[in-house]
From Swiss-Prot:
Protein name in the entry: UPF0253 protein VS_2370
NCBIfam families reported for this sequence: PRK04964.1
Family: Belongs to the UPF0253 family.
Coiled-coil regions listed: none
HAMAP family, per database record: UPF0253
Length: 67
């Protein structure tokens, strides 16, 4: 996936990180898994959103990418 395929909010933050206005996190995969896990565990969110977050987190964990 390319940045231009992402929503406006993602593209805006990408630009801010690239310009130094927003902090860069070197362990991006760990950050993503933690965030997806938090979303999956949040019972105030719709089950469909939680399921999607859990699926994405599980796929990242099983992938061969490492921080």
């Amino acid at each position: 996936m390319k940045v231009y395929d992402c929503c406006d909010l993602v593209r805006e933050l990408y630009s801010q990180i690239g310009s130094g206005d927003q902090g860069y996190i070197p362990k991006a995969i760990t950050c993503a898994v933690k965030t997806l896990n938090d979303l999956a565990a949040d019972e105030s969110l719709p089950k469909e959103a939680r399921d999607r977050a859990a699926f994405a987190a599980a796929n990242l964990l099983i992938s061969d990418f490492e921080d």
